Amino acid sequence: MNSAVVVFPGSNCDRDMAEAIRIASGKAPQMVWHRESELPSGLDFIAIPGGFSYGDYLRCGAMAAQSPVMRSVKSAAERGVPVLGVCNGFQILTEAGLLPGALMRNAGINFICRDVALKVENSQSIFTSRYDNGAEIVIPVAHHDGNYQADEATLDRLEGEGRVAFRYVEECNGSARNIAGILNEGGNVLGMMPHPERMVEEAHGRSDGRRLFEGLLDAVSTTNGHSRMAVS
Amino acid sequence: MKVSVYVTLKNGVLDPQGKAIHHALEGLGFRGVNDVRVGKLIELDVDEAVAQAEIEEMCRKLLANMVIENFRIERQGQTTGHPAGQPA
């Protein structure tokens, strides 16, 4: 799987993301600095990592969404290339207009850093195919602005179209309908506040996040016409 | 020319910061504060030639997030804006 991790000034989960991709796919991603106007060619997957890009100036993800590299990420997403945004990456994808809604300050004001239980609401997506529908998994969150909000019509549409990928099992940060992660209309862009890249090997305590990357690898392998065995 | 852009949360959008400040004011003993909402003031120094429409575009594209925020532009004493900005 040819993948890239976009790095912004202030990204701090870029190397964890790269390591998770390497562990799951056997191939390290290319790290792409935000000033690049072109992404490497032939990418199967793009990850927008967590962190505090541009020091969260103006709004979380607002400045990063305007970086040169994001124009290429947008056009890749429109071509159907899978894009995963985690935490600040999710904020950047909403600010860039690749996902609907906005991520606001946590309802309880506090920065939340702990493991949370998530329900897999849609196991049919390219990111969630290795999970059972309705399964409960545990993935850590670490954010100050993860309170997902959108107007009621948008929320209804997300629910109706199966675009809520993950939901917090218990109220976490004030998010509308406890939404933790959503898909775009095409199903190839996923934004989520919890960090799957921090739960990929037994040393992390659990490896629930690893299946997300493995599922993606399955999808990419199928698209590229290889069998799963040939890749793994 | 000085242009002030006021960015505020839309009505109905929960403002946890405003709530915390409200509690703090009450803690300090101030009575009669019914609500607190936190916004931003962004001051621009622009050429006279910059059209109003362009400043509005700056607001829509970057300065405000139209999903949750409204903006109001004050330019040389005039006030214009989109208090009822359309949700994206």
Predicted regions and their residues:
Chain B
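Long, contiguous binding/interaction regions
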Residues: K2-L41, D47, E54-A88
